[in-house]
Amino acid sequence: PDQKDGFRWLMGISRLALGPLLADDMGLGKTVEILAYLEEFREQKRDAKVLLIVPASLLGNWGRECLKFTPSLDFSIRHGKEAKKKDFPFLTIVTYQGAATSAAIQEEKWDLVILDEAQNIKNRNTKQTKVIKALDRKQAIAMTGTPIENSLLNLWSIFDFLSPGLLGDEKDFASFVDSTAEDKMENLKKVVTPFILRRLKSD
């Protein structure tokens, strides 16, 4: 039921052309929800190009899950020199480093870019983060079990990728979170809550 709810939520928010953050705890089915969404996305846009950026340690897992749950999905894992190829199937899976160093990936116009473990772009000053935020994309989805690791600025950076401008620029947001006023934090929750699906194993 959680995975079905997650899929329906993704479909609903994406129809509004908004960038969702799937922030469920690890083990609650984020991968399956994304794959179900991609199957529907492909039905709607047969010639679409989707880029999925993941940590290197998860490349194999994503490949296995694709074969298990969506065997008809046309996908390719691009690692090392493979990331420099220019011909892209419906779904291209690449590491953060691969996306940050591949001119072919950076020059492509993507219909959808998905980040797994999106906390990897928490530092806006790294080349990796800058390159990924500059990718040409029509839609974006982020996944992470830890949307706020050490600072609310981590959350700002993810939303700066998903919906640039939603939370203002980094300087304004930093000034905002420096305030401990409870009403301000409530206002922040009102802004971001519609874009975040966060479920815990303890729920």
Predicted regions and their residues:
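ASCE P-loop NTPase motor core, strongest for the SF2 helicase catalytic module
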Residues: 1-203
